[in-house]
Amino acid sequence: MPEYRSKTSTYGRNMAGARALWRATGMKDDDFQKPIIAIANSFTQFVPGHVHLKDLGQLVAREIERLGGVAKEFNTIAVDDGIAMGHDGMLYSLPSREIIADSVEYMANAHCADALVCISNCDKITPGMLMASLRLNIPTVFVSGGPMEAGKTTLADHKLDLVDAMVLAADPHASDEEVATVERSACPTCGSCSGMFTANSMNCLTEALGLSLPGNGTVVATHSDRKQLFLNAGRTVIELCHRWYGAEDATALPRGIATFAAFENAITLDIAMGGSTNTILHLLAAAQEAEVSFTMQDIDRLSRNVPQLCKVAPNTQKYHIEDVHRAGGIFGILAELARGNLLHTDVATVHSKTLGEAIATWDIIGTQDEAVHTFYKAGSAGIPTQVAFSQSTRWPSLDTDRTEGCIRDMEHAFSKEGGLAVLYGNIAQDGCVVKTAGVDASIHVFEGSALVYESQEAAVKGILSDEVQPGMIVVIRYEGPKGGPGMQEMLYPTSYLKSKGLGKQCALFTDGRFSGGTSGLSIGHASPEAAAGGAIGLIRDGDRIRIDIPQRAINVLISEEELASRRLEQHAIGWKPAQSRTRKVSSALKAYALLATSADKGAVRNKTLL
């Protein structure tokens, strides 16, 4: 049987010094026979999704200790993409994913932890911890801080979120008072932003991967039911320790759970719920850490066969994550996918022997279990707060309408093809990504003239000064992982296009990426990126570009000979922006850029250079 990793530092006379230090943390003689379980928290007062996490690590720790383990908590960094957006702060967001993954690895391996509980929530924290858990491959459970409640105001007949505030602020017809009212109401509570943005998408995907408990992605941060998720995470990690160290059960380990089939399940869910395009980036990165050969080609294949069964903000103003929970949460969507034979139900999870067994237990349509129904009635209270577990509101009924509700069955899908698509062509030879869930059907085929910008800042200036006209395709390049560096999100350009009334009249194409809050014909992750010699760097103002989502194609309409000629010219001058940028790139960011791969590889480090 496997031995506790922690014995390396707790067993034998030669470890007397290490034990002395362990004792200084509060450990006693009996504790040296127990599993030492690391709790990776991510509390910070900078991020609304993390402001309430301060005491939650100790909540998990006390449960672990009650059940016979030793719990040791540490913290990782956490960047708020919304606060970092629109300025050079966004250069640090994606690189922070690698820092988080490394820091969890460093702490767990330096101290020989036997298992891990990951308390994550926002955009790069869940992916970073996911990468670390698959790299370490020790028993691991994820539990997130939970989604924010949606905002409300008398100025709108729909719920609000961060994007509403951004779009209204750029609308010249909106008064300062109106903007201020929406701003104050858009983000009322602690938690990750209330739509199907990147943070919530990733927390939902951990359910499909099998690494978190049901409800992890959908119980709002303020609800008392989420406390039980944290306690259950402590219980579950102890059970996983017993299964691995006591019975050598490989399905107690992250790599035994997050198999190729599980990654297919995760992206199938992602496509069905119209998740953020960033999830593709992060799943590709996580798969590499798991040593699973899961690629853009697999995503492309699945995207053609999976319908969209759930539509949530920013793809509609009608529903937010709290509404997904009322409709049965992620297991409600998984159940419909299983009924359509689109899931691998024989894969393991941290809480059930198989995903199929879990669906049978947690599907509100298939079960009569009143406890399950009560769980999914957990709702929002509409009271501004930064306190976790502070309310116990429940909906009077569940949303079980699979014809016109928040979650649909296969027959009544929002669209027969899913919410994400991979496009290929002569300006994205290794692929690019579009969230079709946010694209109006009238522009699924779009042809326009290119207007090229060498940075996000230049594009924002151009959009706000009316350089961009109907029928144009805005090209923003040298914003990839290497070229940015850091692959900035383009939420401001897309939001400003909407505020200018161009959301259905223009497209945007970039080697950068998009916030989960983005909608419209926004195509990102162009690979190879411009800084790596990608053909997006060869596009010129006025070039005609054709986008064909049904055919999964994107091409600049010039000859191969012209492209080849331009490539020779570009090689001669180097793959760098044509206009100088005032951007300050620190040595830390330069180090990231040296090793960064393009988006089709998950923007992970190029290990061949190590």
Curated annotation (Swiss-Prot):
InterPro entries assigned: Dihydro-acid_dehy_C, DihydroxyA_deHydtase, DiOHA_6PGluconate_deHydtase_CS, ILV_EDD_C, ILV_EDD_N, IlvD/EDD_N
Residue list for modification N6-carboxylysine: 124
Subunit structure: Homodimer.
Keywords annotated in UniProt: 2Fe-2S, Amino-acid biosynthesis, Branched-chain amino acid biosynthesis, Iron, Iron-sulfur, Lyase, Magnesium, Metal-binding
Function in brief: Functions in the biosynthesis of branched-chain amino acids. Catalyzes the dehydration of (2R,3R)-2,3-dihydroxy-3-methylpentanoate (2,3-dihydroxy-3-methylvalerate) into 2-oxo-3-methylpentanoate (2-oxo-3-methylvalerate) and of (2R)-2,3-dihydroxy-3-methylbutanoate (2,3-dihydroxyisovalerate) into 2-oxo-3-methylbutanoate (2-oxoisovalerate), the penultimate precursor to L-isoleucine and L-valine, respectively.
Keyword Lyase among record annotations: yes
Family: Belongs to the IlvD/Edd family.
Name recorded for this polypeptide: Dihydroxy-acid dehydratase
The keyword Transferase is assigned to this record: no
Binding annotation for [2Fe-2S] cluster: 122, 193
Residues involved in Mg(2+) binding: 81, 123-124, 489
GO aspect biological process, one term: L-valine biosynthetic process
